[in-house]
Amino acid sequence: MKKPVVVLADTDIKIITPLELRFLEEYDDKIDLQIITDREYFDEYFSTPKNVDVLVADEALYSSELQKQNIPKMFVLTEEVGPDKTSDLIAERIQKYSSIKEIFNRIVSLSSSVFGSSFDPVKNTQVLLF
């Protein structure tokens, strides 16, 4: 079965690194996780059609050109909550400076249709004493 492709794109390493770690902790090798931190590379990467299941991008990187891509779930990390240039687009908005756990949980809960059963978190072995 093909792994879902998740692209995290933000020039702010302080946001993208903990989010990347969270995805790796929960889903290990069940997803194809790609990280983009450079604006020029982001534009070049999406200049041709890509097979991406979930895109999480900073609002500075997001443009209406991304609607031409076949991306089932798009999330825009915004600094403020409220209407802005992405409010009329197909992307879900997430406040960038909320907790990483909150950002991650929102992405996962709104993307369950994309990942189906392959999106179950990695279960670590636990020892229980009675």
Predicted regions located by residue number:
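A short, hydrophobic beta-strand element within the central beta-sheet of small alpha/beta folds
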Residues: V54-A57, Q67-D84
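A short, well-structured beta->alpha microelement
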Residues: L24-L66
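Flexible, charged surface loops at secondary-structure boundaries
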Residues: M1-K2, Y45-N51, Q67-N70, S87-D88, ...
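Short acidic, S/G/P-rich loop/turn micro-motifs used as interaction or catalytic elements
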Residues: D12-I16, Y41, A60-S64, V81-P83
